[in-house]
C-alpha cells in the first residue's frame, strides 16, 4: 500500500508493508516513523479487534519505505491497517497493490478525516496509482482532482469492502446536509407594533424600493 509523507515537499511515495512471523507476539514499526505514527500500532490493533478481526499471536513488523524520510501524521493508520490485513491474508495482497491510502482510525474502527488530502491525491496521480482511498469526510476535497479515481470510506468494514470491490465506492455520491434557508427566529415584525397602521402600510408598499424613515415610529 502507498501513502505520502505530508511533511515532505517533494512528491515521494511512502510504501507501507507488513510481515508476520513466529516469535514473541509483538507489533514493531520500522522505517523512521515519528512518535505520532508509532501510536498507530495501538489504534490499528484495537480497531481491528473491536471489529471482529482476530489474529493469532504473531510477531508483526510494519515497514515504511524509504527509511531516510521521517514519517509523520495520523494519516498512516489506514495503510497500516490494510498492510496488516494483507499480511494475515484476510485480504489479498494484490488488492492493496498500487493503491494510495490515507486516514486516521478510531478505536471503534471509524475512519476520520485528515488534513492535506489534495497533495496526497496529486501524488497518486503523478505515481500512476490505480486509485485513492480517503476518509469519507475528505471525499469532496479529494475529488477536486478530476483525473484520479477517489473512493471514500467511513470505517474499517468499508475499507475492506472497497479494497476487494472498489467500483461502488469510486462511484459513491457525496451526501451533504443542506442548511435550511428558512430562519424560524425572525425576531420582531410588524405584528409586534401597536398602531401605526399608516406607517406599516407605507413600509409594505415601499418594501422593494428605497425607504427612509425619519422621526420616532
Which residues make up each language-model segment?
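Peripheral, non-AAA+ core regions of ATP-driven protein-machinery
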Residues: 4-211, 215
Amino acid at each position: 500500500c502507498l501513502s505520502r509523507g505530508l511533511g515532505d515537499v517533494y512528491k515521494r511515495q511512502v510504501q507501507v508493508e507488513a510481515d508476520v512471523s513466529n516469535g514473541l507476539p509483538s507489533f514493531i514499526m520500522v522505517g523512521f516513523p515519528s512518535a505520532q505514527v508509532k501510536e498507530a500500532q495501538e489504534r490499528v490493533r484495537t480497531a481491528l479487534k473491536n471489529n471482529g478481526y482476530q489474529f493469532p499471536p504473531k510477531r508483526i513488523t510494519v515497514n515504511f519505505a524509504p527509511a531516510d524520510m521521517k514519517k509523520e501524521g495520523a494519516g498512516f493508520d489506514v495503510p497500516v491497517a490494510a498492510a496488516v490485513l494483507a499480511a494475515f491474508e484476510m485480504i489479498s495482497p494484490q488488492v492493496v497493490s498500487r493503491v494510495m491510502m490515507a486516514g486516521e482510525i478510531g478505536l471503534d474502527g471509524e475512519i476520520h478525516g485528515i488534513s492535506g488530502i489534495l497533495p496526497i491525491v496529486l501524488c497518486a496521480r503523478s505515481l500512476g496509482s490505480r486509485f485513492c482511498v480517503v476518509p469519507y469526510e475528505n471525499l469532496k476535497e479529494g475529488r477536486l482532482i478530476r483525473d484520479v479515481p477517489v473512493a471514500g470510506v467511513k470505517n474499517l468494514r468499508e475499507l475492506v469492502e472497497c479494497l476487494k470491490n472498489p467500483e461502488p465506492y469510486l462511484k459513491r455520491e457525496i451526501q451533504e446536509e443542506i442548511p435550511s434557508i428558512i430562519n424560524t427566529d425572525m425576531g420582531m415584525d410588524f405584528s409586534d407594533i401597536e398602531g401605526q397602521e399608516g406607517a406599516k402600510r407605507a413600509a409594505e408598499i415601499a418594501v422593494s424600493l428605497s425607504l427612509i424613515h425619519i422621526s420616532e415610529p
